[in-house]
Curated annotation (Swiss-Prot):
Intervals, Extracellular compartment: 34-42, 95-100
Gene that this sequence comes from: SHO1
Membrane topology (UniProt): Multi-pass membrane protein
Disordered: region residues: 164-183
Bilayer-crossing regions: 13-33, 43-63, 74-94, 101-121
Chief place where the protein resides: membrane
GO biological processes: regulation of actin filament polymerization
Protein name as annotated: High osmolarity signaling protein SHO1
Species in which this protein is naturally found: Meyerozyma guilliermondii (strain ATCC 6260 / CBS 566 / DSM 6381 / JCM 1539 / NBRC 10279 / NRRL Y-324)
């Protein structure tokens, strides 16, 4: 579980909501600190601290790209924070003290943020609201990772190339088995075949074997398996996306971003959205 800043800054929704939450939290704690503590509700302090823990937790989950695994847990935790902030805002908004009013304003902003988080994290990935929000991060990620480079395409061509050679070798063995016995009179002219020619032939054979081994080593290795949580239809405008059905098992790798490299059981290779699958190994 690696912490990568790119996971966080690559999601505009994460940046916007966490930044808004930190600003609202600073307003709330500044108002609480400037209020006379003799008449300030003690439980509001716990609500402010609890809200900070929620913001830090969400930031950490985005940094580790595990936010999708704890969405339902977050909904419960944020619902508790929503009760805290709305209760504090209701108790402070009618006060005449400027510090309490400042804290009430911060709690109102935090309540708005908590409500947005509950709707987003509690919503289905295919719901209109979630798809609208995710579209911003998906577009930016597709632009960076959606197109394969010419070198990667060239490597794929090289990995496919050795297949005809194996087919030719098989045909050569069959033709050798069917070749009739040759007498010594038919072998005239082969006495000039030198050992240098033999060494050259061996060098060419070894070179071909090394090329095949190198191509096999360059082939992508899928270290993880994931189960599809929902069915997904690939974007026809992006040739690198793959379609899959719910509960289908995929081989995945490169799981740091919002799009993972995946391979279906049919051998089809492409990219899939990380919020549609769940790691099982």
């Amino acid at each position: 579980m690696a912490i990568r800043l790119s996971n966080f800054i690559g999601d505009p929704f994460a940046i916007a909501t966490v930044s808004f939450g930190l600003i609202a939290w600073i307003v709330a704690i500044a108002g609480a600190g400037s209020s006379p503590q003799s008449h300030f509700p003690r439980f509001t302090w716990w609500g402010i601290v609890y809200e900070l823990l929620i913001i830090l937790l969400i930031t950490f989950l985005y940094l580790t790209n595990t936010i999708e695994l704890y969405k339902f847990t977050l909904v419960g935790l944020i619902a508790v924070a929503f009760v805290y902030t709305t209760n504090s805002a209701n108790g402070l908004v009618y006060e005449s003290n400027s510090g309490k009013l400042c804290c009430a304003a911060g709690c109102i902003l935090l309540s708005m943020l908590n409500l947005i988080w509950i709707v987003y994290f509690g919503g289905h990935p295919e719901s209109p609201t979630n798809q609208f929000i995710d579209s911003f991060s998906i577009k930016s990620h597709t632009h960076n990772h959606g197109q394969l480079s010419s070198d990667e395409k060239h490597d794929d061509d090289l990995r496919v190339a050795p297949a005809p050679e194996a087919f030719q070798d098989n045909n050569l063995r069959q033709s050798q088995n069917k070749t009739p016995y040759m007498s010594s009179s038919q072998l005239n002219g082969l006495e000039n075949f030198s050992s240098a020619d033999v060494r050259q032939s061996r060098d060419l054979t070894n070179s071909r074997r090394q090329t095949v081994i190198a191509d096999e080593e360059d082939a992508p290795v899928f270290r993880y398996k994931a189960r599809a949580l929902y069915s997904y239809s690939a974007n026809p405008e992006d040739i690198n996306e793959i379609s899959f059905t719910k509960d289908e098992i995929l081989d995945v790798d490169d799981i740091d971003g919002k799009w993972w490299q995946a391979r279906r059981a049919t051998g089809e290779v492409g990219i899939c959205p990380s919020n549609y699958v769940k790691l099982i190994e």
